[in-house]
Design a protein with these regions (language model features):
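Active-site-proximal loop/helix of nucleotide/amide-processing enzymes and allied scaffolds
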Residues: 1-22, 61-63, 77-161
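Glycine-rich, small/polar surface segments that engage phosphate groups of diverse ligands
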Residues: 26-86, 90
Length: 161
């Protein structure tokens, strides 16, 4: 056997798997931004919500039932770096058909910054390309939340497929 073939045979195998432990009828359904907020809060560490910025995604199926919530990034006091590849890999692995984004502002501000808006636009673009729509983006604090889709129009993807 040739050296190249021998090395190829020893290459790391990539295996994708996903198993949802909840029955379909037991999964919570998201019908509005408040439902999403309440679900996100159940998995948020209250000790960190005013300490460090975190970014999470909610994975939804065709019926807007929650498949799960994934923490994508955890950062400092006023920022975190979102790995776009990790975000969409998580969604694709779970066979999600829609996403809701959420992050907290440790300052308690519920205003979308310019960086928040640019990131939302970028993720909407990529989601459109992957046929995986980004449905909303929430900012969460101890005192409440703000929904991008409730206060502004979600960005329209510019990609032509």
């Amino acid at each position: 056997m040739g050296k190249l073939r021998e090395h190829f045979m020893k290459a790391t195998e990539v295996k994708l798997s996903y198993k949802n432990r909840l029955r379909i009828e037991d999964r919570p359904t998201v019908t509005n931004s408040f439902d999403a907020y309440e679900l996100f809060l159940t998995g948020w560490d209250n000790d960190k919500i005013e300490l460090q910025e975190q970014f999470k995604i909610m994975l939804l199926d065709n019926s807007n039932s929650c498949l799960g919530i994934v923490e994508i990034a955890s950062g400092g006091i006023d920022y975190c770096v979102v790995d776009v590849k990790l975000l969409f890999a998580s969604a694709l692995k779970a066979r999600a058909t829609g996403l809701i984004l959420a992050h907290n502002h440790p300052t308690g501000s519920l205003r979308f910054s310019e960086q928040d808006k640019k990131l939302t636009e970028k993720l909407v673009e990529i989601g459109k390309f992957l046929d995986l729509p980004v449905l909303d983006h929430l900012i969460i604090s101890c005192d409440g939340y703000r929904s991008y889709s409730d206060v502004e129009t979600m960005p329209t993807p510019k990609l032509k497929l």
